[in-house]
Amino acid sequence: MMETKEKVVYPRYAVIRLRGIPTTPRDIATTLHLLRLRRKFTMVVVPGTPSIIGMIQKVNDWVTWGEIDADTLAEVLKKRGRIVGDKPLTLEYLQKWGWQSFEEVALAYITGEIDSLSCRKVRVREGQRPPCIPYLKPFFRLHPPRGGLNSVKLHFSVGGDLGYRGPLINDLIRRML
């Protein structure tokens, strides 16, 4: 008898780079590059797999991270989402690929219905929608936060801005849109 494996749905984390490029050790720079955090104030949304969590913990002194909710992700997609060619992600583009709204895409990603937000072009049959948003850039360029940061040298638990901040990451993201 074959048992069907249930799909494991990992939590989705938003990771924002807060510190710049100079004096970054090579191994940290490589890990940031693999996470697609190549510039200050860029954000990626990643699943919380053990390997990704290990990478985030390695660069913990350069980033802040926490669980993103569907409303914040929909807002980020709407305001800061870009497709290849640096064109804005529009509702018409989503509807072309079978999605009805930004909220629908965000909820599908957070709940694990789709595994990735962005992908290269995929072949789909007529009437089906792809398991991602084709040609979406896998990172989001954000503004510096309104009201500023406390400290990019201290961790969040001691009054700074670096490291794990849990669901409070959503407040920071809204300040950076």
Curated annotation (Swiss-Prot):
GO molecular function: RNA binding; structural constituent of ribosome
Domain of life: Archaea
Gene that this sequence comes from: rpl30
GO biological process: maturation of LSU-rRNA from tricistronic rRNA transcript (SSU-rRNA, 5.8S rRNA, LSU-rRNA); translation
Cellular-component GO terms for this entry: cytosolic large ribosomal subunit
Cross-referenced InterPro entries: Ribo_uL30_ferredoxin-like_sf, Ribosomal_uL30, Ribosomal_uL30_arc, Ribosomal_uL30_euk_arc, Ribosomal_uL30_ferredoxin-like
Annotated keywords: Ribonucleoprotein, Ribosomal protein
Classification of source organism: Archaea, Thermoproteota, Thermoprotei, Thermoproteales, Thermoproteaceae
Name recorded for this polypeptide: Large ribosomal subunit protein uL30
Subunit and partners: Part of the 50S ribosomal subunit.
Family per record: Belongs to the universal ribosomal protein uL30 family.
